[in-house]
Amino acid sequence: MSQIINFRQLAQLYKSELLDRVIPFWLNKSQDTEFGGYFTCLDRDGSVYDTDKFIWLQGREVWMFSKLYNTVEPRQEWLDAAIQGAEFLRKYGHDGNLNWYFALDREGHPLVEPYNIFSYTFATIAFGQLSIALASAAKGGHSAVRVCGDSIAAEKLASEYASIAKRTFDIVLSKTDNPKGRWSKASPGARAMKTFDLPMILCNVALEIESLLEPAFLQKAIDDCLHEVMDVFYRPELGLIVEALGKDGNLVDCFDGRKLNPGHAIEAMWFVMDLGKRLGRPELIQKAVEICLQEVEYGWDKEYGGIFYFMDRLGKPRHELEWDQKLWWVHLETLISLIKGYQLTGDERCLTWFQRVHDYTWSHFRDPDYPEWYGYLNRQGEVLLPLKGGKWKGCFHVPRGLLNVWKILEAIQNS
């Protein structure tokens, strides 16, 4: 299989799509030049259809522009876009104590209380990655940056943003046993469950802000989340990762307890591969690759192609009406995991599946007429919603996926 893939040509395809079509779309269409922050509810052509602002997506867009600045090239327009989004978040995104709201109106007034732990995690990586960009800018001779029309020392701003990232991360870790806190809708004494999504995200967050953390603190955070992902939520008897367990770590026969989310599991595996590389643990990388392949095989729709959104570990009906839809992020994250697995292990199964998922993803999610990609397809692979952004889809999974796959393909070619 490796003999028939032109890695150089494929890397150029991903690079061009990212830099020529996707990033210009968000740079030009999403920035709110009047009130700050970003519009994410963008129709097929980039026109704004709703002006509310969701903290998940605000933080993710800050992170994305910062990551591009740090890993592709230090373009001023990317840094400026990240800073203006971060300043909107710093001013309006939390309650004054870094409890991050879920949603704001266009001007920054809170709409939804800070119940959602992932608002905190995405704020963490946003301010963490931007602090790294600003520190780099300061070292590169850009001693000052423009913030709301004022000139501010880049080093000072980097320090302030790093502090926000670290303090927010501390709050996240303090909430792992009860993520929603006082905003939980569960009845006291109700069925006690824990979910896969938080330890999964923490695997990524820990590496994103690694340079800001004390080594011992970082190591404990990594050890804890790796244990949860690989030893608790991964069930060898199923060969799969489950989305929720009882607090005691046992399987529970209820809707939440039977739920499988192949995309989540597959995405988590490239986080684990990164940690395995960082820790020098090839056996961890190999285990992550095996789980990734098992999840792709299990989640693949053998009739219509693509990966199911939700599944049930006992084959029972799901209550989510969207269970059989094909979503953009699932497929982008799968591409990252598969090509990273091939890069790190040389396992040809990863390359075979990568080609298959690549073909499906590019032929179904990419809009040939307008930039950015569709997010939501029905089971048959037809476009359900022509939007390019909304309450859950923003400047994140498509550009992050394109960036990662481009860089990995380039590295494979160069090696």
Map each language-model feature to its residues.
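Glycan-recognition and catalytic cores of secretory/periplasmic carbohydrate-active enzymes
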Residues: 1-415
